Regions:
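N-terminal secretory signal peptides that target proteins for export/translocation
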Residues: 1-8
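Structural motif
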Residues: 242-253, 258-261, 324
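Beta-strand-rich domain onsets/edges
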Residues: 209-237, 245
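A short, amphipathic beta-strand motif
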Residues: 237-245, 275, 334
Length: 339
């Protein structure tokens, strides 16, 4: 039995359907960890004991049985467990009649009919210890008002359950959204995903697509940062610094490290008012840094604030950055100019 006499708060993260979502991304953003901030500081959300236990609701829906849902979730969790630089484990505790979003000290996956949330494919919520960031309970619901597929190659007009489960499992672990992806406007409104560089991109691929069943370097760096294996800190490095405009820091600017040897993109946002950032989990060696504004997305998909300073030009850092093994670079400053 988990301890319940703690300060608890609920956080909800939703995944949007590509066909009607109003969110878009740019091709160089990076993983963002879920966290809480108060007057003292901030904490990241994570499971402090493993395996993380979960149950699956026993209700079938059109086209998907509860057993098929369990199998899709199991495959999604296995994909995260297979990350060689992270240490995560999950334990299925059986089927339950309880539904997601019940405050019952049980993490439950299942379907809910939410036709009012016509943009939402799935949603993950948490109860957490707001002092430490420990995840106490996490529920995930898949919207049964949209059509789902569990076939190996996907089905036209139906969203791939395993792909969406993989995204929600990332939230379950404490990852927030990445904006590493490209979209284009749709004639009927919203945006269409052209390509995603992270499973944690907040807009799903179109129905019938199964490309979202694999992790990207951005996802791998994120989960390894939260749950590092024994050698992760020693075998990787980090880059740190500030993003400034006219001498002032820019909160929410995102800095991306590009590895020219592999083509991998990994990064993080400037998460302090001073514009300070740190990008962890980088392969040692030369990287190219680029800063871009979050000017083509709904801010609320990434941050709990109504606005950010996005009035600056995308900027490359003037020098190549050499990331050391098992350590960090000296702090650098990346000045940007207003548009």
């Amino acid at each position: 039995m988990r301890r319940c006499a703690r300060v608890r708060g609920r956080i909800v993260i939703s995944l949007l359907a590509s066909a009607i979502a109003a969110v878009s991304g740019t091709p160089a953003q990076a993983y963002l960890k879920l966290g809480l901030r108060d007057s003292v500081g901030s904490v990241s959300l994570r499971w402090t004991t493993q395996p993380a236990h979960y149950s699956v609701n026993d209700r079938d829906v059109s086209g998907v049985s509860s057993e098929q849902l369990r199998q899709a979730i199991e495959r999604a969790f296995r994909t995260w467990e297979d990350v060689p630089t992270a240490s995560v484990r999950f334990q299925f505790d059986g089927f339950t009649s309880a539904e997601p979003l019940e405050d019952d000290n049980t993490s439950t996956f299942g379907f809910l009919s939410r036709p009012d949330l016509d943009r939402v494919l799935a949603s993950t919520s948490f109860f957490v210890d707001t002092r430490t960031g420990e995840i106490l309970e996490s529920d995930v619901f898949f919207n049964s008002s949209v059509p789902w597929s569990v076939t190996q190659n996907g089905e036209p007009g139906r969203f791939d359950l395993e792909s969406i489960a993989l995204h929600e499992a990332g939230h379950f672990l404490g990852l927030s959204h990445s904006a590493l992806g490209e979209t284009e406007p749709r004639s009927g409104g919203g945006r269409r995903v052209l390509g995603a560089g992270a499973v944690m991109f907040p807009i799903a691929f179109a129905s019938g697509n199964v490309e979202g069943r694999r992790l990207f370097p951005d996802d791998i760096a994120g989960v390894s940062d939260i749950y590092p294996d024994a050698g992760f800190r020693q075998d990787t490095g980090s880059v740190q610094g500030r993003v400034t405009k006219d001498g002032d820091g820019i909160f929410g600017a995102h800095v991306v490290a590009y590895d020219p040897r592999t083509g991998d993109l990994v990064g993080n946002f400037a998460l302090e008012e001073t514009g300070e950032f740190i990008i962890a989990g980088l392969r040692p060696g030369t990287h190219i840094l680029r800063v871009e504004p979050l000017d083509d997305a709904e801010i609320e998909s990434f941050f709990d604030r109504p606005s950010l300073d996005v009035d600056f030009q995308p900027t490359f850092y003037e020098r190549l950055v050499v990331v050391p093994r098992g350590g960090g670079t000296p702090s650098i400053e990346i000045p940007v100019r207003a548009r």
